[in-house]
């Protein structure tokens, strides 16, 4: 922290992480390193399967490979820095590093939400309008949906970062988290945060609530269409088509709600940090397993790819 006149220029923050007990640090390092490697490897395998097998060159797997890429980036935004801090027994993150981490966190969390909405729309078209699926979900529309998702996420991230850069911080520079989270940084500010809170809550309603409404609407229509199917086998096939996506959506929004409730209902900041692990680390790690465990196409594509390499 560098002082100049009456102004305070922040040079670094302290990330408190989970525990200050030294005996737990090797365990935490091994745990999060393992989870990070599983996340990267699992999502890379999904991308590899979607690229290598021409049978998987469909809208569903195009969106899934994009989601896997975003999950890798999402985990890489936070976990490597946390591992470095644990290994070096340091809690320090520079001001520029903190703003950068916050910027990418906001970018990828919103992009995750938008891509899940796009995938819900894809499921809706596949089940409710199967005869027109290939016409509606054209390569041009698929590319446009992903592009718009990226643009909206980048613009929101830039806006959140710009208004955060206008904040002044006091002497309390401890972030009770393992990464620089937007809400925690606003709480640390000693200047007026009205604009920041307005922008943050407006973006949350628009870019988190909006996609959730879209997903719920899509699944309401999907359930109505499935109920109209006469055969039991047809109903089972339709349900199995969207089961994986519905599981991922439930985990994503369920853990997000858990983090929000834990931060508002408890004063234990470390418990909030632990709850956020489910949201930021565990969910990207589970996604490849959820999509591949019951997916014969992905299993077949990976088996064929590795057999071809032998």
Curated annotation (Swiss-Prot):
Gene3D superfamilies the record matches: Rhodopsin 7-helix transmembrane proteins (1.20.1070.10)
One GO cellular component assignment for this chain's record is:
plasma membrane
Give one GO molecular function term: G protein-coupled receptor activity
Mode of membrane association: Multi-pass membrane protein
Organism whose genome encodes this protein: Homo sapiens
In this UniProt entry, which cysteines form S-S bonds? Answer: 98-190
List all topological domains (Cytoplasmic): 48-55, 122-140, 219-238, 294-310
Please name the InterPro entries in this protein's record: GPCR_Rhodpsn, GPCR_Rhodpsn_7TM, Olfact_rcpt
In Swiss-Prot or TrEMBL terms, this protein is called: Putative olfactory receptor 7A2
CDD domains for the chain: 7tmA_OR7-like
> Which biological process, per GO, is one annotated for this protein?
signal transduction
Glycosylation site residues: 6
Q: Which residues point to the Extracellular side?
A: 1-26, 77-100, 162-198, 260-272
- Its main localization is membrane
Mark the transmembrane ranges.
27-47, 56-76, 101-121, 141-161, 199-218, 239-259, 273-293
Which Pfam family name is an example for this entry? 7tm_4
Q: What does the record give as the function of this protein? A: Odorant receptor.
What keywords are assigned to this protein?
Answer: Cell membrane, Disulfide bond, G-protein coupled receptor, Glycoprotein, Membrane, Olfaction, Receptor, Sensory transduction, Transducer, Transmembrane, Transmembrane helix
What family classification does the UniProt entry report for this protein? Belongs to the G-protein coupled receptor 1 family.
Cellular compartment(s):
Cell membrane
PROSITE patterns (UniProt xref): G_PROTEIN_RECEP_F1_2
């Amino acid at each position: 922290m560098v002082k100049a006149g009456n102004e305070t220029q922040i040079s670094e923050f302290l990330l408190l992480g989970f525990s200050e007990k030294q005996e737990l640090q090797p365990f935490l390092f091994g745990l999060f390193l393992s989870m990070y490697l599983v996340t990267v490897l699992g999502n890379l395998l999904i991308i590899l399967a979607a690229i290598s097998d021409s049978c998987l060159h469909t809208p569903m797997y195009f969106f899934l490979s994009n989601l896997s890429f975003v999950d890798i980036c999402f985990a890489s935004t936070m976990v490597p820095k946390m591992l470095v801090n644990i290994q070096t027994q340091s809690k320090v993150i520079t001001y520029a590093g903190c703003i950068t981490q916050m910027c990418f966190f906001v970018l990828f969390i919103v992009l995750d939400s938008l891509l899940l909405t796009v995938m819900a729309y894809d499921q809706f078209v596949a089940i409710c309008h199967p005869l027109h699926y290939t016409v509606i979900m054209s390569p041009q529309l698929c590319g446009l949906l992903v592009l718009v998702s990226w643009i909206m996420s980048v613009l929101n991230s830039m806006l959140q970062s710009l208004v955060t850069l206008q904040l002044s911080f006091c002497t309390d520079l401890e972030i009770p988290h393992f990464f620089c989270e937007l809400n925690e940084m606003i709480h640390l500010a000693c200047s007026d945060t009205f604009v920041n809170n307005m922008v943050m809550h407006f973006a949350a309603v628009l870019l988190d609530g909006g996609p959730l409404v879209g997903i719920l609407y899509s699944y309401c229509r999907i359930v109505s269409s499935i109920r109209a199917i006469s055969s039991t086998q047809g109903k089972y096939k339709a349900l199995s088509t969207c089961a994986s996506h519905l599981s991922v959506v439930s985990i994503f929004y369920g853990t997000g709600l858990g983090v929000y409730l834990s931060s508002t209902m408890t004063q234990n900041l470390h418990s909030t940090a632990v709850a956020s692990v489910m949201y930021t680390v565990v969910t990207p790690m589970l996604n490849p397993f959820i999509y591949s465990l019951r997916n014969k196409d992905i299993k077949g594509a990976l088996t064929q790819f590795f057999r071809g390499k032998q």
